[in-house]
Amino acid sequence: MSAVLKSPADSAIADISLADWGRKEIRIAETEMPGLMAIREEFAAKQPLKGARITGSLHMTIQTAVLIETLKALGADVRWASCNIFSTQDHAAAAIAATGTPVFAIKGETLVDYWDYTHRIFDFGPKGSEGEGPNMILDDGGDATLLMHLGKRAEKDASVLAHPGSEEERILFAAIKAKLAEDSTWYSRKSAQIIGVTEETTTGVHRLKEMSAKGTLLFRAINVNDSVTKSKFDNLYGCRESLVDGIKRATDVMIAGKVAVVAGYGDVGKGSAQALRALSAQVWVTEIDPINALQAAMEGFKVVTMEWAADKADIFVTTTGNRDVITFEHMKAMKDQAIVCNIGHFDNEIQVAKLEEHCQWEEIKPQVDHVIFPDGKRIILLAKGRLVNLGCGTGHPSFVMSNSFANQTIAQIELFTHPEGYDVGKVYVLPKHLDEKVARLHLKKVGAMLTELSDEQAAYIGVPKQGPYKPDTYRY
């Protein structure tokens, strides 16, 4: 098959000959993703996404391939790009492109390519046609959503592109300027057709909520990240397995006996700290929130500041979703051969730009660099400060991603089939009964038996026998 297969014209992938390998791994992943497979079985005949044109911006992995094929099985037309320049699994991209689905994703693509690909996933039909652009966005980190909003603003006021704050913004702004020079109403036409967006991750949700608060959000939005079966599983249990996998694939370092600093003790930080401790590292945590700091202390982690820890620890992991968590000054103070990495969405948690400005770089292998300071000291930076688990590893296991992607699929169905239930410009979460449904779909795979309430028990605690079992305020 791979010897004669030609790369589709409406795609940008590394190597179509990898499609057969990708297809074999997709088949394995399907056996580990019961939620998505059950949704296919339940909804395929009904075709609830027939007529949906979904622009997908999410890591192009084997697990994402199962999501894409689930959306297609439910009737959707899909165009896809990765949301990170290092996270693509090229064999997964090839397998999906080989089926005729447009895919624009290459591991190690440039930022120029990245924003070109993100533009191309919005081109569904001829200019001016009813199906010119998408009517749904499935986003991870909010870049596809950002592109529509920023581009539409720039159509009316080019000054919004005048002062980029980073190299990535410079490239993004240049891409928007080039598109506007080619087609001055491209963004407004595309955005006008979009019903809504479903957002996968914490960083993207922050962006949505910020736009909603300002009254500038153009679409309806569902916050998939804060579904319990996403944040308490993907963010915690997924990171618990994929963080150390990425670090060890990149460095072959012994974790035991090392001092590891985890910046942030949210769900991602909790999973990361547990993983490092399980391999017998001494784990320290930095936190801004007194509640999270107290949680970390009660779990036996030493809570410190980055300033205090910088010259003492061996491994540093950022998990916060904030910027400048590890600064150039912190890294100047670190030990020789300290390992620095990030498992938050964007690379600005670590001041990588200042390392590029002031230090020499020596590539050890793809996504593993020695950063050499003027005094000769070296630190090891993984994935250039981007997601270490996807840049240096293969990301979260299939099973936990089935939880997340089942939520994404249900959210897409909800917004597409019931847009009248969601106000434009507002951000929603899926109702509790759908969260519980996603959990139910995964119990059999792990051999879990669910106890059923009697009528008397249900009446005693005041909940329906079939759920929902907890109020929305319950924290799990």
Swiss-Prot record:
Alphabetic keyword roster: Cytoplasm, Hydrolase, NAD, One-carbon metabolism
Required cofactor(s): NAD(+)
Enzyme class, broadest EC rank: hydrolase
Molecular function terms, GO-annotated: adenosylhomocysteinase activity
Binding positions for substrate per the UniProt entry: T61, D140, E200, K230, D234
GO BP, sorted A to Z: L-homocysteine biosynthetic process; one-carbon metabolic process; S-adenosylmethionine cycle
Transmembrane segments: none
Entry keyword annotation includes Transferase: no
Signal peptide feature range: none
Annotated InterPro entries: Adenosylhomocyst_ase-like_sf, Adenosylhomocysteinase-like, Ado_hCys_hydrolase_NAD-bd, NAD(P)-bd_dom_sf, S-Ado-L-homoCys_hydrolase_CS
One Pfam entry name: AdoHcyase
Chief location bin: cytoplasm
Location in or out of the cell: Cytoplasm
Cytoplasm listed as a keyword: yes
Positions annotated to bind NAD(+): 201-203, 235, 264-269, 287, 322, 343-345, 389
Cofactor: binding details: Binds 1 NAD(+) per subunit.
GO cellular component: cytosol
Its EC number(s): 3.13.2.1
Reactions it catalyzes: S-adenosyl-L-homocysteine + H2O = L-homocysteine + adenosine
SMART domains assigned: AdoHcyase (SM00996), AdoHcyase_NAD (SM00997)
Pathway(s) annotated for this protein in UniProt: Amino-acid biosynthesis; L-homocysteine biosynthesis; L-homocysteine from S-adenosyl-L-homocysteine: step 1/1
Family: Belongs to the adenosylhomocysteinase family.
Its biological purpose: May play a key role in the regulation of the intracellular concentration of adenosylhomocysteine.
Entry protein name: Adenosylhomocysteinase
Species the sequence originates in: Acidovorax sp. (strain JS42)
Gene from which the chain derives: ahcY
